UniProtKB/Swiss-Prot annotation:
Entry GO MF terms: glucosamine-6-phosphate deaminase activity; identical protein binding
One term under GO cellular component: cytoplasm
Family per similarity comment: Belongs to the glucosamine/galactosamine-6-phosphate isomerase family. NagB subfamily.
Active site per the UniProt annotation: D68, D145, H147, E152
Gene that specifies this protein: nagB
Alphabetically ordered keywords of this record: Carbohydrate metabolism, Hydrolase
One BP annotation, GO: glucosamine catabolic process
Name of the protein in question: Glucosamine-6-phosphate deaminase
UniProt superkingdom: Bacteria
Reactions catalysed, as given in the entry: alpha-D-glucosamine 6-phosphate + H2O = beta-D-fructose 6-phosphate + NH4(+)
UniProt-listed NCBIfam families: nagB (TIGR00502), PRK00443.1-4 (NF001684)
EC top class, as a word: hydrolase
PROSITE patterns attached to this UniProt entry: GLC_GALNAC_ISOMERASE
């Protein structure tokens, strides 16, 4: 069962994540961070960047692996996840760009029709993560349908990094990054699988707003099912889910989650 932390707002969630990762980097200067895009992690990255600056933490050895990338977008496209990770993580934290990887880096706009090249990219990415020693902390968002990364409902809970077709709901949700034009949103992606994600030593999932309440309810208190990919976190030995009041609104046991976190010894961290 993941630890559930209910916070007032995204800034408070960001501070919890930022302190967790900053302490990790201090203890392990070559830490491997799992990175996600979307709006949910932004406050977390901002909080971490502030701590790194305020405490003069050396991040020169930190490595990173992103969750996913669109198929068909060149790396220079402003909404490619290569560009997004560089803009929201690499630059603010001062990471070495050569040590931060995105699954589509070797594809760089390769069209979907080039199946031979695309098919090899997923297994190669999993091998690169393993060669780095695995992910220490993986940050995650969650879709309104319970997807994590681009693992849509119905994805295998044992899957590795591979090419997937984006669900229509995901394309609708992501159209806000493409001038609200769904026709600009790619139809395919390459994503870490649930099996790959579950190998990370610590998972931290963030969710905010009433629109995520049903997905959080299914993730935390529903059954483990491929039709809610995030529900796999119930099986992880060290998973933390940080939500605001609106995202937690459908949780039946939220009073217990608050009680447990309030009485948790500080030395345990998250």
């Amino acid at each position: 069962m993941p630890e559930i932390i209910i916070v007032k707002n995204e800034a408070e969630a960001g501070e919890i994540y930022g302190r967790c990762v900053a302490d990790l980097i201090k203890a392990k200067p070559d830490a491997v961070l799992g990175l996600a895009t979307g709006s949910s992690p932004l406050a977390a990255y901002q909080a971490l960047a502030k701590i790194v600056k305020d405490e003069a933490i050396d991040v020169s050895g930190v490595r990173g692996f992103a969750l996913d990338e669109y198929i068909g977008l060149p790396l220079t496209h402003p909404e490619s996840y290569h560009a997004t990770i560089h803009r929201t993580v690499v630059e603010p934290l001062g990471l070495d760009p050569a040590k931060v990887h995105v699954p589509g880096d070797v594809l760089n706009g390769t069209p979907l029709e080039d199946g031979d090249k695309i098919a090899l990219a997923g297994p190669a990415y999993d091998r690169a993560i393993e060669a780095a020693g695995g992910i220490d902390v993986q940050i995650l968002g969650i879709g309104t349908d319970g997807h994590v990364g681009f693992n849509e409902p119905g994805s295998s809970l044992a899957s590795g990094t591979r090419v997937k077709t984006l669900a229509e709901q995901t394309r609708i949700d992501n159209a806000r990054f493409f001038d609200n034009d769904i026709n600009q949103v790619p139809t395919h992606c390459i994503t870490q699988g649930i099996g790959t994600i579950m190998k990370a030593r610590h998972l931290v999932l963030l969710a905010f707003g009433a629109g995520k309440a049903e997905a959080i309810e299914e993730t935390v208190e529903g059954g483990v099912s491929a039709f809610c990919p995030a529900s796999a976190l119930q099986m992880h030995p060290h998973a933390t889910i940080i939500v605001d009041e609106e995202a937690a609104s459908r949780l039946r046991h939220k009073d217990y989650y608050r009680y447990a976190y309030t009485h948790k010894p500080a030395w345990q961290g998250i």
